[in-house]
Every structure is written in structure tokens, then in C-alpha cells.
Amino acid sequence: LEEVDRFIEHEIKPLENSNDNIRFFDHRREDARTDWERNGLPNEEWEALLGEAKRRAIAAGIFSYPFPSVHGGRDGGNLGMAIIREHLAAKGLGLHNDLQNEHSIVGNNIGLLLMLEYGTPEQQADWLPGLKSATRGFAFGITEPDHGSDATHMETVAVRDGDDWVI
């Protein structure tokens, strides 16, 4: 945690405080993050700022904490990630960690866990470098009546029927 704190103090806070970037985190944040001319999509400047923070975290080796050491990471597990996320959340809203859009200087990467657990060696070779460099990512969208976006309580199932799937 001390290494993460030093990184935040020396790299992230100066970036957050330059060019009025603080507008993305104070009372102006919703308007500053939103491009109203593009139907409410995220503002490109906001996205670029998140990208720069992530690039710095990657260069410092902070972002790759959860990756296995054989893939250039630090073998960080779920408990370690939970401790780091709680530590970052306790610091309040900022460029170091923004739960509104799952941005974090420490990679919170569901795709990594899925790929390590279920990916073939070929898929891992294809996907892991991009996940570690944040040039590739996973996303999923789910919703069910009475469950919203809680992936752990979904009731819909898919059953293989020959070459097809029946939902």
C-alpha cells in the first residue's frame, strides 16, 4: 500500500490537479465527464485523462498487481485486491480510483480472471498481453427482472442442443 500511495502522490495527484482536471472529480464532475453534443457519451478529454493515468500505472508496475508473475504481474489475489480497493476508496473520489466507471490504477480486471481460469493456452497468449497493457478489455452486459446487474444471481441459463444453444 505504501508503494501505491507514493505512486498516487508523485504521479496521479499532480496529473489530477493539472489543467483543471479536478473538474472531473468535484461538483462539476457529471457535466465535465459528459459530451452532450454526442448524446451523452463520455467526454473525450475525460477518457484521455483516464488513459494517461492507466499508462502511468502500467509503466510503474502498479496496474499489473493481479497478474501472475509469469505474465509480468505480482500474483495479487482477490483478498489483496479487496484490501487495495478499500484503501483507494477510503481516499475518496479521485483519479486514482473511480468506481463510477471501474477505473483504477490497480487493474480490476474480470477478463483476466476468466482468461486464467477458462482460457485455452492459445487464448491466453492472445489476450493476456493486451489485458496487461490495457489495450484490450472484457465487458459484459446483463440484466434480469429482480436481479439487475448482479451476475452472481442470474437465473437465465443456456443449454447445449446439438450445435445450438437454447436459452
Predicted regions and their residues:
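Amphipathic, small/basic residue-rich leader segments at the start of a protein or domain
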Residues: 1-105, 121-126, 130-133, 160-161
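A cross-family signal for key residues in well-ordered alpha-helices
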Residues: 85-86, 112-116
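Glycine-rich, Trp-frequent "lid" loop and neighboring beta-strands that shape
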Residues: 74, 116-167
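Short, conserved phosphate-binding/catalytic loop or strand-edge motifs used
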Residues: 104-112
